[in-house]
């Protein structure tokens, strides 16, 4: 079975990628990374930084998660990210996404040994 850490990588890390010149980025990636298999995942963020840098956030600024848990961490620096949002009127299996890029600090929930990201909480 896929571990939480592996699922995080599949859903949120695209180190070499960029959506800068590709308005279709989210449509392609959401499908490729299997987030449109049984439903259209409504919102998803991809981080275009090396995996090691994303994992390192687990030792950065400790903050509260949206759900009140205390195992969230905010990156000290802003990261190159792409936010994918389902367009209104889009219906499974024809999932259609709006692609927008940003430079933001990311907030992830971490757990396990090694202590690694398992959930993408927010970007600020």
From Swiss-Prot:
Q: Which UniProt keywords apply?
A: Disulfide bond, Endonuclease, Hydrolase, Lyase, Nuclease, Secreted
Q: In which tissues is it expressed?
A: Pancreas.
Entry annotation: catalytic residues: 12 (proton acceptor), 119 (proton donor)
Which Gene Ontology cellular component terms are annotated? extracellular region
Mention one GO molecular function: ribonuclease A activity
Query: EC?
Result: 4.6.1.18
Keyword check for Lyase: yes
Name the positions where substrate binds. Answer: 7, 10, 41-45, 66, 85
Q: Does the keyword Secreted apply?
A: yes
Q: Which cysteines are disulphide-bonded?
A: 26-84, 40-95, 58-110, 65-72
Q: What is this protein called?
A: Ribonuclease pancreatic A
Could you tell me which species this protein originates from?
A: Cavia porcellus
């Amino acid at each position: 079975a896929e571990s939480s850490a592996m699922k995080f990588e599949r859903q949120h890390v695209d180190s070499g990628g960029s959506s800068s010149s590709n308005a279709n980025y989210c449509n392609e990636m959401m499908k490729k990374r299997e987030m449109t298999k049984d439903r259209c995942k409504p919102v998803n963020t991809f981080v275009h930084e090396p995996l090691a840098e994303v994992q390192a956030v687990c030792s950065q600024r400790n903050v509260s998660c949206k759900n009140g848990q205390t195992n969230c961490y905010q990156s000290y620096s802003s990261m190159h990210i792409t936010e994918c949002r389902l367009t209104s009127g889009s219906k499974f299996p024809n999932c259609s996404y709006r692609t927008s890029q940003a430079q933001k600090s990311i907030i992830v929930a971490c757990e396990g040994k090694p202590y690694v990201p398992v959930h993408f909480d927010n970007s600020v």
